């Protein structure tokens, strides 16, 4: 049998120790494998080696503490030899909405010097179709002494595959283990090797396909979500125009056995749903009309929210605006592509009033929000003329809605509106 399939993967390297990479490394370490985490962020590396975490994810702190103290997990800024390399680095898009693969290229150049015959390289980063093949090409440029799948196919020295993460922030540790995984190797043997690696910790099914299908699968999943969210967001704007409560409307419409409308919000954020559909649009701009339109609807929703805040602010001489929530979804600290950040930043730029922020999951505001105060809920409410709910954190559900009676409330998530409807 091929060595890459027989190999026991005793030593595994995870490149990129963020919201996906660190939990993945930790789960693998819990299977008593030696995990070498690699990140260019020295603070993250030092924090992990002190058995602490630099991100917020339920229960991750306990697992990292155990993995580091037992000697199964350590972090470094420089790659070291391993049997398998999992690349989990960001894949943003450029200003023209084209994919930016510079982080993947940098990861390839970083690990190339320590590769040896029989190693497996898996790209976990959500990527445009063809990125796994490009990764193989970048690796081969650095290591002419080794062969890669795009050169020799099944006979290559190095195995390369794509296995996109498909977890929900706040539930990452459970979903890493329980969710099905899509594994797309550049060759069948690449797929077999990657499948063997993921079966070390995945209890869900490991479904094997080719690399390009695996890449497109993740993009499709997120585009599907984006289109459905766009429907809900557009519906919320229509309901505002015609005087219908969108939260009640969705609640009763979803009583139909074949209708499942999602909940609207202030936009769409995060590093997946707000980004990945553009990879499809970039690949097939003439055909991806619905996907493009959905992105445009969701990208426009923060401006719609801002218009409502502007209208409310005109009622006050010196308005104080309290914004509840900054993260891109509830109960996490991840601010990437957050529509709430865009909304708050624009409020400040347009000088709509004094802007306060309540975000229980962070201790320091991003530098882009200069001039904004970070407060707890009670002092923010005491000072506010206008209250804008941007993220439906669980902690905000406990707020006494009677405190909102004398204030202008813009509830973009329906949390307080739905609570009043149910009362």
Curated annotation (Swiss-Prot):
GO terms for molecular function: NAD binding; oxidoreductase activity, acting on the CH-CH group of donors, NAD or NADP as acceptor; oxidoreductase activity, acting on the CH-OH group of donors, NAD or NADP as acceptor. The keyword NAD applies. NAD(+) binds at residues 11-28. It holds the Pfam family UDPG_MGDP_dh_C. Keywords: Lipopolysaccharide biosynthesis, NAD, Oxidoreductase. Signal peptide: none annotated. The active site is at residues 218, 272. SUPFAM superfamilies: 6-phosphogluconate dehydrogenase C-terminal domain-like (SSF48179), NAD(P)-binding Rossmann-fold domains (SSF51735), UDP-glucose/GDP-mannose dehydrogenase C-terminal domain (SSF52413). Its EC number is 1.1.1.-. One of its GO terms (biological process) is lipopolysaccharide biosynthetic process. The keyword NAD applies. Gene3D superfamilies: Cytochrome c1, transmembrane anchor, C-terminal, NAD(P)-binding Rossmann-like Domain. Probably involved in synthesis of sugar components of EPS I, by converting NDP-N-acetyl-D-galactosamine into NDP-N-acetyl-D-galactosaminuronic acid. NCBIfam families: NDP-sugDHase (TIGR03026), PRK11064.1 (NF008286). Belongs to the UDP-glucose/GDP-mannose dehydrogenase family. PANTHER family: UDP-N-ACETYL-D-MANNOSAMINE DEHYDROGENASE. This is NDP-N-acetyl-D-galactosaminuronic acid dehydrogenase.
């Amino acid at each position: 049998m091929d060595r890459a399939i027989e190999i026991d993967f005793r030593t595994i390297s995870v490149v990129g120790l963020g919201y996906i990479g660190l939990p993945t490394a930790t789960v693998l370490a819990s299977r008593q494998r030696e995990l070498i985490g690699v990140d260019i962020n020295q603070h993250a590396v030092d924090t992990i080696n002190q058995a602490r975490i630099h991100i917020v994810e339920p229960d991750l702190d306990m697992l990292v503490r155990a993995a580091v103290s037992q000697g199964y997990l350590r972090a470094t800024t420089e790659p070291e030899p391993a049997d398998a390399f999992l690349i989990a680095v960001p894949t943003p898009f450029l200003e023209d909405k084209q994919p930016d693969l510079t982080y993947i290229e940098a990861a390839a150049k970083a690990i190339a010097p320590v590769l040896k015959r029989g190693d497996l390289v898996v790209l976990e980063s959500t990527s445009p179709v063809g990125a796994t093949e490009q990764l193989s090409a970048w690796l081969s440029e650095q290591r002419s002494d080794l062969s890669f799948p795009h050169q020799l196919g099944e006979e290559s020295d190095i195995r390369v595959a794509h296995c996109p993460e498909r977890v929900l922030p706040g539930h990452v540790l459970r979903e890493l283990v329980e969710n099905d995984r899509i594994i797309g190797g550049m060759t069948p043997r690449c797929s077999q090797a990657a499948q063997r690696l993921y079966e070390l910790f995945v209890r869900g099914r490991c479904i094997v396909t080719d690399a390009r299908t695996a890449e497109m699968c993740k993009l499709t999943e997120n585009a599907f979500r984006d289109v459905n969210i766009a429907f809900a967001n557009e519906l919320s704007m229509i309901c505002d125009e015609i005087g219908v409560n969108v939260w009640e409307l969705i609640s009763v419409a979803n009583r139909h056995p074949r209708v499942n409308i999602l909940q609207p919000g202030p936009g769409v954020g995060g590093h997946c749903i707000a980004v990945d559909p553009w990879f499809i649009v970039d690949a097939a701009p003439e055909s991806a009309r619905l996907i493009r339109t959905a992105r445009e609807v969701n990208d426009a929703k923060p401006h719609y929210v801002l218009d409502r805040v502007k209208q409310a602010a005109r009622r006050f001489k010196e308005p104080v605006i309290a914004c509840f929530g900054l993260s891109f979804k509830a109960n996490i600290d991840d601010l990437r592509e957050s529509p709430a950040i865009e909304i708050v930043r624009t409020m400040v730029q347009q000088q709509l009033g004094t802007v306060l922020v309540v975000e229980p999951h962070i201790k320091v505001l991003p530098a882009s929000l200069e001039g904004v105060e970070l407060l707890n809920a009670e002092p923010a409410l005491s000072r506010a003329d206008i209250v804008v709910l941007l993220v439906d954190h669980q902690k905000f559900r406990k707020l006494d809605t009677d405190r909102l009676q004398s204030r202008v409330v813009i509830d973009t998530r329906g949390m307080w509106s739905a609570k009043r409807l149910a009362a």
